[in-house]
Swiss-Prot record:
The system is composed of three essential subunits: KdpA, KdpB and KdpC. Belongs to the KdpC family. Its main location: membrane. This is Potassium-transporting ATPase KdpC subunit. GO terms for molecular function: ATP binding; P-type potassium transmembrane transporter activity. It is found in: Cell membrane. One of its GO terms (cellular component) is plasma membrane. The chain crosses the membrane at residues 13-33.
């Protein structure tokens, strides 16, 4: 029994210490640091808007994509909605999904005969990307302009206001935040 305790006591103590350090102390320190250094992002980047009745309400997060399907809105990437996002790019299932999404885009805007940008017909790995490429936003400018009765110049200006540059100036591609563009478009009515 003494030999058993000599073996198991350090293992149990080590397990408890590692659990405390990795499960409580480290996450606590990271949370405190994130809340202090990146308060808005650490709390979900919640966007609040003034409503017609004068109250302010939460409308969404700048970091989580929302589904927009009305033609007067900028529409983001396809949501995964229970569909696997890790499909083989050459699989029949992926091909059918993309064809279905292409047909949806053609039905939404039958006058647009340009090539549909890839990010509008494929889901992201997370399935909730808040951003689309500049090409995907540009593809939708004419439709939004027509549906809202505003100039394409106004739509392009709003898109430009909500376009983020490359990370550190060289990493990745510029992206357009879909929710922020749509909120700005809605504010034009006011």
């Amino acid at each position: 029994m003494k030999r058993f305790m000599q073996i198991w006591k350090p293992a149990v103590v080590g397990f408890l210490l590692l659990t405390l350090m990795c499960g409580v102390v480290y996450p606590g320190i990271v949370t405190i640091f994130a809340s202090a250094a990146f308060h808005d992002k650490a709390n979900g980047s919640i966007i609040e808007e003034k409503r017609a009745d004068g109250t302010t309400g939460k409308v969404g997060s700048a970091e989580i994509g929302q589904t927009f399907t009305k033609p007067e809105y900028l529409i983001g990437r396809a949501a995964s909605d229970g569909v696997a996002t890790n499909l083989n790019p050459t699989s029949e299932e992926q091909k059918q999904l993309v064809e279905k999404r292409i047909a949806w885009w053609h039905k939404l805007d039958p006058t647009n005969n340009r090539v549909i940008p890839m990010d509008l017909v494929t889901a992201s790995a997370s399935g909730v990307d808040p951003d689309i490429s500049e090409a995907a936003a540009a593809y939708q400018v004419d439709r939004i302009s027509r549906e809202r009765g505003i100039s394409t110049k106004q739509v392009k200006e709003i898109i430009a206001e909500h376009t983020s540059d490359r990370l550190l100036g060289f990493w990745g591609e510029p992206t357009v935040n879909v929710l922020q563009v749509n909120l700005a478009l809605d504010r034009l009515k006011m």
